[in-house]
């Protein structure tokens, strides 16, 4: 029988995903674990009165996308929804154009990235207002927000309430909307300016540790 992605053992699908991420970071490992916690979180946000905005980058989306339907629901429920849709994703151009049109019709703000560059980042941020305070959940992936390919390709998805990562993600989306490629980030490495130097510094650090006989490790996905 075909392999079926399994539930993440650290996530209770009968409880609010938002509350669980606030308590502790969650890591999904596709295709061995199902994408449902992420999809449920976005769906929850679309109907959560405390959620005020949803922002996401989309490179390849499924033709039948539960994620995009939730973004449409969120916009129709009066939330601020911003979508960066990459129209130059090879072989998926028409599908992305069709979803971009549907998202715009629902009231989402759709932007198309910077001239001369493809946006390949996989990042989503949900912002909530609790009284006078704002909280942010940030979702970072190595693969597309795509229900179909998440069952096929090996990728990670981090769901976190880390304040510093949340501030970086907020700045990232602000810079995207302004076409600014030179943001100054504390935790995120963002191409085309900041990612390579960050990686090279990390490699140099581990090289020096290894030369000094100290424990050293490099792990890439």
Residue ranges and their predicted role:
Residues 1-218:
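N-terminal localization/anchoring segments of enzymes in phospholipid and broader phosphate metabolism
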